[in-house]
Amino acid sequence: MEEEASSPGLGCSKPHLEKLTLGITRILESSPGVTEVTIIEKPPAERHMISSWEQKNNCVMPEDVKNFYLMTNGFHMTWSVKLDEHIIPLGSMAINSISKLTQLTQSSMYSLPNAPTLADLEDDTHEASDDQPEKPHFDSRSVIFELDSCNGSGKVCLVYKSGKPALAEDTEIWFLDRALYWHFLTDTFTAYYRLLITHLGLPQWQYAFTSYGISPQAKQWFSMYKPITYNTNLLTEETDSFVNKLDPSKVFKSKNKIVIPKKKGPVQPAGGQKGPSGPSGPSTSSTSKSSSGSGNPTRK
């Protein structure tokens, strides 16, 4: 089966690609600095391939996953940015083909003979709560399949939570980070696919759904190319620590505030205060105190 890389301009002339990418091809192509928006076209999977996968793994594939594979046997879309005449690969959106939708096992995670087993790394102290579902297990309680290797930054997984034989309604999508901690993403594959597309495949975007968030470098890219339906709360506090922002209106306002006290200084000659030097001295010290105080809230 042949796979064909589509050049940027082909997205608009191929309706099935436009439908598959939910129209973000045109959004990316119109973004400043974005270049080489490429989709690797894959033929649809045949129904017998899905049936064979289900029989081999003793799992019923969810209906939305089936429909996806009947449209395209996997998905891979990339885009780059041009900075100072250098082209840097940036965005990557991928879903494994059926043949690569393989189960995560001990051998697939570790190859060293004396490495700890996945059972040794189980953390049962953080089980299901009101706001967080029960985490997947590496033993027979869960069946885990890799949807995307995330370019080495983790693994997005289709998780059957009831073991084998596994039913389609028992699936969820989880992110396994490099430290082998689990993070819930979505209840369904369709919901995850929307997240993947709307986050534009930005580096480490899955970490936005973890307690420790995305890295400082990833925040820079998120600020330049904001995801389409991004939760701004994830960026509001921490982004200011890493991205320098210059607001001209605020700069000029602060200058005006410095000028105004100097004009008012001589108008208040009243009692008990030290002459004209009084207003300028305290105001500068208070200004320095406030500025030093405001420079400390950022923490690493």
Curated annotation (Swiss-Prot):
GO terms for cellular component: centriolar satellite; cytoplasm; microtubule. It comes from the Eukaryota. Keywords: Cytoplasm, Cytoskeleton, Microtubule. InterPro entries: Knr4/Smi1-like_dom (IPR018958), Knr4/Smi1-like_sf (IPR037883), TPGS2 (IPR039231). It is found in: Cytoplasm, Cytoskeleton; Cytoplasm, Cytoskeleton, Microtubule organizing center, Centrosome, Centriolar satellite. The keyword Transferase does not apply. Residues 276-300 have a biased composition (Low complexity). Subunit of the tubulin polyglutamylase complex (TPGC). The complex mediates cilia and flagella polyglutamylation which is essential for their biogenesis and motility. Part of the neuronal tubulin polyglutamylase complex which contains TPGS1, TPGS2, TTLL1, LRRC49 and NICN1. Interacts with CSTPP1 and LRRC49. This is Tubulin polyglutamylase complex subunit 2.
